[in-house]
């Protein structure tokens, strides 16, 4: 099974080698036919502490790095 790749915005870089990335998805409500925006936060491994709040990054699934980290920052 291929690894998922998501794109989002860094919302926190407070922890060492970890960034929090907010990923937004849009879909049309089946009944209301209205476009709805939902977001989810992922904690991703940032080896070099290179990314700051507001950066747009791509993250990829990986083996668990810690209790909450299952993603790595792929590129900006």
From Swiss-Prot:
The entry's keywords: Ribonucleoprotein, Ribosomal protein, RNA-binding, rRNA-binding
InterPro entries reported for this sequence: NA-bd_OB-fold, Ribosomal_uS17, Ribosomal_uS17_bact/chlr
Keyword Ribosomal protein: yes
GO biological process assignments: translation
Complex and partners: Part of the 30S ribosomal subunit.
Record's function text: One of the primary rRNA binding proteins, it binds specifically to the 5'-end of 16S ribosomal RNA.
Family: Belongs to the universal ribosomal protein uS17 family.
PANTHER family: 40S RIBOSOMAL PROTEIN S11 FAMILY MEMBER, SMALL RIBOSOMAL SUBUNIT PROTEIN US17M
Protein name, as recorded: Small ribosomal subunit protein uS17
Provenance organism: Ruegeria sp. (strain TM1040) (Silicibacter sp.)
Gene: rpsQ
């Amino acid at each position: 099974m291929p690894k998922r790749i998501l794109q989002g915005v860094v919302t926190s870089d407070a922890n060492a080698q970890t960034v929090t990335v907010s990923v937004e998805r849009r879909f049309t409500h089946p009944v209301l036919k209205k476009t709805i925006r939902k977001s989810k936060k992922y904690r991703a491994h940032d080896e070099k502490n290179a990314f700051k709040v507001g950066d747009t990054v791509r993250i990829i699934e990986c083996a668990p790095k810690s209790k909450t980290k299952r993603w790595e920052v792929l590129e900006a």
